[in-house]
C-alpha cells in the first residue's frame, strides 16, 4: 500500500477500516471522517474474530484502548491540534514495561506481573495519542526466531497458519499482517523485527542503536537490543519511528543526536544517483532459489529507479552468526540473573524451610523455558574463568571487524542490500529440535545489530505464496536513507505487481 492518504483520507465505508494504512486512519480521524473510537472498535472486533487462530496477542486492553480513543475524539472535537498518529491503534510487544497492563516477556517467570511504570517508548506513544490495544506474543525474553518459544503458545503466520510468523517479534508482525492493528512495536536483537516482517509481508525497521530509548525494555542483550516499528507501508513505519525516537536521559546508551528526517525521506521516493551495494556474502548455499529470484528482481527495480548498483564484499559477515551466539547469550546470562524469585515475578518452593538459593533454583527451573536455559548456560560458560578471552573476547574482536566491513562498504555506497532471510516461513515445529537450523534464520540480519547501524526489511515478493523480504542497511544515524530507498522501492514493486503485496494475504 503506497498511497499517500494524508492528503486524501478514505472515508469509512469505501474501504474496510482495518485495512487502512496508519497514515490514512490518522488522516480520516483528523478531518472527522472516522472517529478514533470507530477505528479502535474495528481493530478490537478484528482481534475477536481472528486472534483465536493467529494468537498474536497475549493481553488485549479493550477498556483502556477505548478510553484512550474517546480522549482523542473529545480533544479533536474541542479543536485541539493532535499528532500525526493520534487515534491509530497499535500492538505492543510484551517486552516493554507498561503501566496498567501485564508484562510477561512471553515467560512463566513473569506471568501476572504488572510493572509500576511505562517504558520510555510507551510514554512517547501515549503522548502521541496512539491507542495501545494490548501486548503481543513473543519468543520468551526475545530469544527465538519463530515465536514458538513463548510460554503461552506459538503465534501463527496469517499467510499460512501452519507456519511460523518469525520471531522474536512474531506476535507484533502477525497482528499487523492479520489486520488486527495497523502498527506494532517490536524489538530487534539479531533480526527480531526484520525477520518476522519479511515472513509476514511487512515493513520492519531496526533503528540505529542508541536512536530509540531502551528504558523499560526488558533486556535480553543490552548492547544489541533496539525497539522499532512494524507496519504495512514505509510511510507508516516512518511515522512510528519518528514518534518513538530521540534522546532519553533515562537510558545511558541513548545518543543525544538529531532524529533523522525519516518521514520526509519515506515520501521523497527519488533515489536517482544513490549508490546501492549488493552484499556478495549473502547468496549461494542455504538460500532458497525463490528468495534469490525475488531479491534479484528487487535489485533490478532499484536500477530502474536510477540507483547505481554495485557488488560489495564484507568478508567478516560470515563470522557474524557465531560471534552473535557468544555475545548475546553472555549478556543474557548477566541480565536474567535478576530473576531470582526475591523481588518480583514467580516464586516456587518457598515453604518457610528452603533457603534463598534453593528457592531461586526451583523458580528458575520452573519459570524459564528450554531456549532461555540453553542461552543462559551458553553465556555463563563463555564468561567463565579460563574461557572468557577464548570465546567472549574473540567474539567482540569479530564484532569490531564486522563494523569495519560496514565502514569500508559505506565509503563506496550509500546503502547495502541483501535478502532479509534465506528462506520463506517454515512449518510450525519444523526446527524446534534443531537450534542451529533455527539460528540460521538470522544469518543476514545479525551484522547490523553487531555494528549498531539501522536496517529495514521490505516485502520483495512471494515464494510459493509466502512473502519474503529485501533488507536495506545504512550507516549509523543515516536511518533516513532506509526510508528514502524503501519508499521508492515499495512504490516500484507495488506498481510492478499491480497492487500491494498484502492484498494477497489469505482471509482468515
Curated annotation (Swiss-Prot):
Biological processes annotated in GO: translation
Disulfide bond residue pairs: none
Active site: 93, 168, 192
Enzyme class, first EC level, given as a word: ligase
Keywords: ATP-binding, Ligase, Nucleotide-binding, Protein biosynthesis
Enzyme Commission number(s) from the entry: 6.3.5.7
Catalytic activity: L-glutamyl-tRNA(Gln) + L-glutamine + ATP + H2O = L-glutaminyl-tRNA(Gln) + L-glutamate + ADP + phosphate + H(+)
GO cellular component, one term: glutamyl-tRNA(Gln) amidotransferase complex
Pfam families: Amidase (PF01425)
Residues spanning the signal sequence: none
Name of the featured protein: Glutamyl-tRNA(Gln) amidotransferase subunit A
Domain of life the protein comes from: Bacteria
Molecular functions (GO terms): ATP binding; glutaminyl-tRNA synthase (glutamine-hydrolyzing) activity
Taxonomy of the source species: Bacteria, Bacillati, Actinomycetota, Actinomycetes, Frankiales
Amino acid at each position: 500500500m503506497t498511497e499517500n492518504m494524508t492528503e486524501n483520507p478514505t472515508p469509512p465505508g469505501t474501504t474496510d477500516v482495518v485495512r487502512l494504512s496508519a497514515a490514512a486512519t490518522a488522516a480520516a480521524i483528523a478531518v472527522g471522517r472516522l472517529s478514533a473510537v470507530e477505528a479502535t472498535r474495528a481493530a478490537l472486533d478484528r482481534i475477536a474474530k481472528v486472534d483465536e487462530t493467529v494468537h498474536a496477542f497475549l493481553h488485549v486492553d479493550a477498556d483502556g484502548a477505548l478510553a484512550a480513543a474517546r480522549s482523542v475524539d473529545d480533544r479533536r472535537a474541542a479543536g485541539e491540534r493532535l499528532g500525526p498518529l493520534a487515534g491509530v491503534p497499535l500492538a505492543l510487544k510484551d517486552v516493554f514495561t507498561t503501566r496498567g497492563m501485564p508484562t510477561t516477556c512471553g515467560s512463566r517467570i513473569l506471568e501476572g506481573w504488572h510493572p509500576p511504570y511505562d517504558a520510555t517508548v510507551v510514554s512517547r506513544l501515549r503522548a502521541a495519542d496512539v491507542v495501545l490495544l494490548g501486548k503481543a506474543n513473543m519468543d520468551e525474553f526475545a530469544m527465538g526466531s519463530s515465536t514458538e518459544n513463548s510460554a503461552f503458545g506459538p503465534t501463527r503466520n496469517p499467510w499460512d497458519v501452519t507456519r511460523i510468523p518469525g520471531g522474536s517479534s512474531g506476535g507484533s508482525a502477525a497482528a499487523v499482517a492479520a489486520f488486527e492493528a495497523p502498527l506494532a512495536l517490536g524489538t530487534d536483537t539479531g533480526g527480531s523485527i526484520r525477520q518476522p516482517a519479511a515472513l509476514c509481508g511487512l515493513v520492519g525497521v531496526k533503528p540505529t542503536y542508541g536512536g530509540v530509548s531502551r528504558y523499560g525494555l526488558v533486556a535480553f542483550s543490552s548492547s544489541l537490543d533496539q525497539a522499532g516499528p512494524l507496519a504495512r507501508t514505509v510511510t507508516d513505519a516512518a511515522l512510528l519511528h519518528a514518534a518513538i525516537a530521540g534522546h532519553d536521559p533515562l537510558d545511558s546508551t541513548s545518543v543525544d543526536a538529531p532524529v533523522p528526517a525519516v518521514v520526509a525521506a519515506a515520501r521523497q521516493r527519488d533515489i536517482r544517483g544513490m549508490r546501492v551495494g549488493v552484499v556478495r556474502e549473502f547468496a549461494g548455499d542455504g538460500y532458497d532459489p525463490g528468495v534469490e529470484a525475488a531479491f534479484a528482481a528487487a535489485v533490478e527495480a532499484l536500477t530502474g529507479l536510477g540507483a547505481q548498483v554495485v557488488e560489495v564484499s564484507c568478508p567478516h559477515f560470515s563470522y557474524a552468526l557465531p560471534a552473535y551466539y557468544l555475545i548475546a547469550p553472555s549478556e543474557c546470562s548477566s541480565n536474567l540473573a535478576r530473576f531470582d524469585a526475591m523481588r518480583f515475578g514467580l516464586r516456587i518452593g518457598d515453604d518457610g524451610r528452603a533457603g534463598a538459593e534453593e528457592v531461586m533454583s526451583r523458580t528458575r527451573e520452573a519459570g524459564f523455558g528450554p531456549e532461555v536455559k540453553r542461552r543462559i548456560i551458553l553465556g555463563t560458560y563463555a564468561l567463565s574463568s579460563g574461557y572468557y578471552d577464548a570465546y567472549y573476547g574473540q567474539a567482540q574482536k569479530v564484532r569490531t571487524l564486522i563494523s569495519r566491513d560496514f565502514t569500508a562498504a559505506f565509503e563506496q555506497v550509500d546503502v547495502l542490500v541483501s535478502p532479509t532471510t534465506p528462506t520463506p516461513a517454515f512449518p510450525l515445529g519444523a526446527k524446534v529440535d534443531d537450534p542451529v537450523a533455527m539460528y540460521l534464520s538470522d544469518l543476514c540480519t545479525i551484522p547490523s545489530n553487531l555494528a549498531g547501524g539501522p536496517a529495514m526489511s521490505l516485502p520483495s515478493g512471494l515464494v510459493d505464496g509466502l512473502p519474503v523480504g529485501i533488507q536495506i542497511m545504512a550507516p549509523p544515524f543515516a536511518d533516513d536513507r532506509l526510508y528514502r530507498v524503501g519508499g521508492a522501492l515499495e512504490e516500484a514493486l507495488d506498481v510492478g505487481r499491480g497492487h500491494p503485496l498484502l492484498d494477497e494475504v489469505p482471509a482468515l
